[in-house]
């Protein structure tokens, strides 16, 4: 499972001009689900997202988590994060889980983050979306449940 985590002052997702998810201060997280992901990857990602310390404390040091600051999370499924461009010029998405298999994993990730006490909004699975991301910093972190960057 792969995630691009962006610290934001606000985030919003629109589908066909209608807002389907919106948050204030927190994270916009783009999530790619890999063919070989398991329940362990979901648990790992949920824990990392909720406890990632990238919000500033009173001394200006990145030391606080989403839970510490009462932040929200906008989770957006994005299979293109699994794209492989090492060969040729067109990305290959063979490492992405098929949509009908990925949806339950995405929903389980949403559920696990909510269980940890974070307000979660989402985009619309498999829809063309317009994603508004008002970066704060900017702070952007890459997380992969299987790889180090």
From Swiss-Prot:
Catalytic activity: glycyl-tRNA(Ala) + H2O = tRNA(Ala) + glycine + H(+); a D-aminoacyl-tRNA + H2O = a tRNA + a D-alpha-amino acid + H(+)
Species this chain originates from: Caldanaerobacter subterraneus subsp. tengcongensis (strain DSM 15242 / JCM 11007 / NBRC 100824 / MB4) (Thermoanaerobacter tengcongensis)
Protein name as it appears in the record: D-aminoacyl-tRNA deacylase
Gene Ontology MF terms: D-tyrosyl-tRNA(Tyr) deacylase activity; Gly-tRNA(Ala) deacylase activity; Ser(Gly)-tRNA(Ala) hydrolase activity; tRNA binding
PANTHER family in the record: D-AMINOACYL-TRNA DEACYLASE 1, D-TYROSYL-TRNA TYR DEACYLASE
GO annotation terms (biological process): D-amino acid catabolic process
Coiled-coil segments: none
Keyword terms: Cytoplasm, Hydrolase, RNA-binding, tRNA-binding
Chief location of this protein within or outside the cell: cytoplasm
Gene Ontology terms: cellular component: cytoplasm
């Amino acid at each position: 499972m792969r995630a691009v985590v962006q610290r934001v002052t606000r985030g919003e997702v629109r589908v066909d001009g209608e807002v389907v998810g919106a948050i204030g201060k927190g994270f916009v997280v783009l999530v790619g689900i890999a063919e070989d992901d398991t329940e362990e990857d979901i648990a790992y990602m949920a824990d990392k997202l909720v406890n990632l310390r990238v919000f500033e404390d009173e001394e200006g040091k990145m030391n606080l988590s989403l839970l510490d600051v009462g932040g929200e999370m906008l989770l957006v499924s994005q299979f293109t994060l699994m794209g492989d461009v090492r060969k040729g010029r067109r990305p290959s998405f063979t490492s992405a889980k098929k949509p009908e298999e990925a949806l339950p994993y995405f929903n389980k990730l949403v559920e696990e983050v909510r269980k940890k006490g974070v307000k979660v909004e989402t985009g619309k699975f498999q829809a063309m979306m317009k994603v508004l991301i008002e970066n704060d910093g900017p702070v952007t972190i890459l997380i992969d449940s299987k790889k180090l960057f």
